[in-house]
């Protein structure tokens, strides 16, 4: 009899739970050996990876995937190099598991502290990019978590080929194959099953479009680490250094248009707008950025700026489009960001310490920056190494989620025959 999707996913979940107990007690050396061996297996399997990827690319073209999607799907030599290097980099990161902090004696004589431990089983749901398979598997493995990976159907052959390399690495290190499992079925019911198994899955991390993440957030029966939007702002304060403001606002928008930490709205104090906006508009024009502005912005810059609608202030474009608004005060800037933003990443450009401190305190975002581009909101730039994603939630992790974000803490208590009286 054919196994149902629910039975198949339950089998994966049960195996992952058992593997998670082995991983939780695995040594750092053992985990690093698995990562290094997986990197070597990827390097040796380049031809196999390319052949599998060609099947996915052919299927994508037949199904009408656009050029951008096909580009994200492709396993080029550069992408494969990046996956290999990513595994090796994660192997060099400090292992957070087992670290004990805040040990202190209580009046009763016991010692109390906190020990960092894995979450258990992490379910990853993602679209298109096969390299996410490596990113997610490596971080989960190093942090002592078993993982179940459900990639997009368009990348099924690539993900299976990558998974075989990871399995070789696990075997060489003496770790269970179920520590990293790739869902082999393309049936969408597998996603519904994965997010509905609290007995076997401890947390879900979705990576993909807003529709996917909204669905998972709505339907999941296990905790979700996610962000829905990247509506990031740069506010140019009255006390800003003009050169810094221009450099930061340029980089925050034009270094790359698609990432979630790209600026979507530029806020400028009206008292410095004449110095900042005209040169910035010329830069944006040369780089093909469409500008949409408030009435005062259009009065200053002219008809080349389209009229911004109310919807523009709350839109993540992921494209060469920028909204611009002139404001009268820092208060207005903070109110605008907290009203329209997505609590992802927001920056102020200012030489005024008091304004900077107010911005840090009152802007309710996962990353708040002073005199720096929003493009720095990234696990690598924060010294976390690789990241599994960025969270705009306040529980359990917030901001770029690296190794530590895939762990929890438990209290540990040391006594010497102590009893409570």
Swiss-Prot record:
Function in brief: Catalyzes the NADPH-dependent reduction of L-glutamate 5-phosphate into L-glutamate 5-semialdehyde and phosphate. The product spontaneously undergoes cyclization to form 1-pyrroline-5-carboxylate.
SUPFAM superfamilies (UniProt xref): ALDH-like
Gene Ontology annotations of biological process type: L-proline biosynthetic process
Organism listed in the record: Stutzerimonas stutzeri (strain A1501)
Coiled-coil intervals, chain numbering: none
Pathway per the UniProt entry: Amino-acid biosynthesis; L-proline biosynthesis; L-glutamate 5-semialdehyde from L-glutamate: step 2/2
Major enzyme class: oxidoreductase
Keyword Chaperone included in the entry's annotation: no
Keyword entries, A-Z: Amino-acid biosynthesis, Cytoplasm, NADP, Oxidoreductase, Proline biosynthesis
Membrane spanning residue stretches: none
Major location category of this protein: cytoplasm
GO-annotated molecular function: glutamate-5-semialdehyde dehydrogenase activity; NADP binding
Subcellular localization: Cytoplasm
GO cellular-component term (any): cytoplasm
Name assigned to this protein: Gamma-glutamyl phosphate reductase
Tree of life domain: Bacteria
CDD domains reported in the protein's UniProt record: ALDH_F18-19_ProA-GPR
EC number: 1.2.1.41
Sequence similarity: Belongs to the gamma-glutamyl phosphate reductase family.
Catalytic reaction annotation: L-glutamate 5-semialdehyde + phosphate + NADP(+) = L-glutamyl 5-phosphate + NADPH + H(+)
Record has Membrane as a keyword: no
Gene name of this polypeptide: proA
């Amino acid at each position: 009899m054919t196994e149902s999707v629910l039975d198949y996913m339950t089998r994966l979940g049960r195996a992952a739970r058992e593997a998670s107990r082995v991983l939780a007690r695995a040594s750092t050396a053992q985990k690093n050996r698995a990562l290094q061996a997986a990197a070597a297996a990827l390097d040796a399997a380049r031809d196999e990876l390319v052949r599998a990827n060609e099947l996915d690319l052919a299927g994508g073209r037949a199904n009408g995937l656009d050029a951008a999607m096909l580009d994200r799907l492709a396993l080029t030599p550069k992408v494969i190099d990046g996956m290999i290097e990513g595994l090796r980099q994660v192997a060099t990161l400090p292992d957070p598991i087992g670290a004990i902090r805040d040990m202190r004696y209580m009046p009763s004589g016991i010692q109390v502290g906190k020990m960092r431990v894995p979450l258990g089983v992490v379910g990853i749901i993602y679209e298109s990019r096969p390299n996410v398979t490596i990113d997610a598997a490596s971080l989960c493995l190093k942090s002592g978590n078993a993982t179940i990976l459900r990639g997009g159907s368009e990348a099924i052959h690539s993900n299976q080929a990558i998974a075989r390399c990871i399995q070789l690495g696990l075997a060489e290190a003496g770790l269970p194959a179920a520590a990293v499992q790739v869902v082999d079925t393309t049936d969408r019911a597998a996603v519904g099953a994965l997010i509905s198994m609290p007995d076997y899955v401890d947390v879900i991390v979705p990576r993909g479009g807003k529709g996917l993440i909204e669905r998972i957030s709505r339907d999941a029966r296990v905790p979700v680490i996610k962000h829905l939007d990247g509506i990031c702002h740069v506010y140019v304060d009255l006390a800003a250094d003009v050169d810094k403001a221009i450099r930061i606002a340029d980089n925050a928008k034009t270094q790359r248009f698609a990432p979630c930490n790209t600026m979507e709205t530029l806020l400028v104090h009206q008292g410095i707008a004449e110095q900042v906006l005209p040169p910035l508009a010329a830069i944006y024009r040369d780089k093909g950025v469409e500008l949409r502005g408030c009435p005062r912005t259009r009065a200053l810059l002219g008809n080349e700026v389209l009229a911004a609608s109310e919807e523009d202030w709350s839109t993540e474009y992921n494209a060469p489009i920028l909204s611009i608004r002139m404001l009268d005060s820092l208060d207005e800037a903070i109110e605008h960001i907290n009203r329209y933003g997505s609590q992802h990443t927001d920056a102020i450009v200012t030489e005024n310490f008091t304004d900077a401190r107010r911005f840090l305190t009152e802007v309710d975002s996962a990353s708040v920056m002073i005199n720096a581009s929003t493009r720095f909101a990234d696990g690598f730039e924060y010294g976390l190494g690789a990241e599994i994603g960025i969270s705009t939630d306040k529980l359990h992790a917030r901001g770029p989620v690296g190794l530590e974000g895939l762990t929890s803490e438990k209290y540990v208590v040391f006594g010497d025959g102590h009893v409570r009286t």
